Amino acid sequence: MAGHDSGNAKRGRSPSFGVFVRKPVERAPAKGASDGAVDSQAIRIDAAQSWPDDAVEVGAVVDAYGLKGWVKLAAHAGAGRGGDALLKARDWWLQKGAERKFARVTQAKLHGDTVVAHPDGSVDRDTALALRGARVFVRRGDFPALAADEFYWVDLIGLDVVNEAGVALGKIADMIDNGVHSIMRVEYPATGKDGRPKTGERLIPFVGVYVKAVEQAAGRVVVDWEADY
């Protein structure tokens, strides 16, 4: 399986997306922008919308866009790899500092290598600027569906990794994009040269030659990989 954010062990082609590759977010405020928490006037809050258990951070507001309350976002993955979640989801949860808010998004679209969107109730540039720096979360359940043999990185992290002989190799701690394919960063308990316990690490390419099965229901990934590699 290859790609920024999801994998496809069977086909070896670049898949859709998964956990999100973060892009740097400019934190310095623009002139006239607010440094405070999310302005309650910038979005309409539904008190019944509590923070979802399956919230996944997918981007951040980096600036206002235009004069009519639109915001510009840096997605943690590009279109077709994770930015799609920003485009599809209409319910967003925003976090700026310690304050969390819910926003219903009326429109979202691609704009160059960014996403621009209009949160309901953001009526002008000032209210949009007040959202600058807010982290954007959506429900995992609102992600676009993938093919049966494609996987979101966020669903792979935490799975056990075993080889075909049943030897435990550790747990997926992270997924890495090397520009060609995805790599599983697998952590396991080990012992250092000084005899003290430490965390060992294995880097296993997420491609079909090594990944033999992804068994999400069983919570594991089966690989063709030896413990002494």
UniProtKB/Swiss-Prot annotation:
Compartment(s) of residence: Cytoplasm
Gene from which this protein is expressed: rimM
Predominant location category: cytoplasm
Disordered as annotated region, ranges: 1-21
Record family assignment: Belongs to the RimM family.
Xref: PANTHER family: RIBOSOME MATURATION FACTOR RIMM
Organism: Burkholderia mallei (strain ATCC 23344)
GO molecular function: ribosome binding
Swiss-Prot/TrEMBL keywords: Chaperone, Cytoplasm, Ribosome biogenesis, rRNA processing
Gene Ontology annotations of biological process type: ribosomal small subunit biogenesis; rRNA processing
Notes concerning its domains: The PRC barrel domain binds ribosomal protein uS19.
Subunit description: Binds ribosomal protein uS19.
Record has Cytoplasm as a keyword: yes
Entry annotated with the keyword rRNA processing: yes
InterPro entries: PRC_barrel-like_sf, PRC_RimM, RimM, RimM_N, RimM_N_sf, Transl_B-barrel_sf
The PRC barrel domain, residue ranges: 148-229
Source domain of life: Bacteria
Function: An accessory protein needed during the final step in the assembly of 30S ribosomal subunit, possibly for assembly of the head region. Essential for efficient processing of 16S rRNA. May be needed both before and after RbfA during the maturation of 16S rRNA. It has affinity for free ribosomal 30S subunits but not for 70S ribosomes.
Pfam families recorded: PRC_RimM, RimM
Signal peptide positions on this chain: none
GO cellular component assignments: cytoplasm; ribosome
Listed name of the protein: Ribosome maturation factor RimM
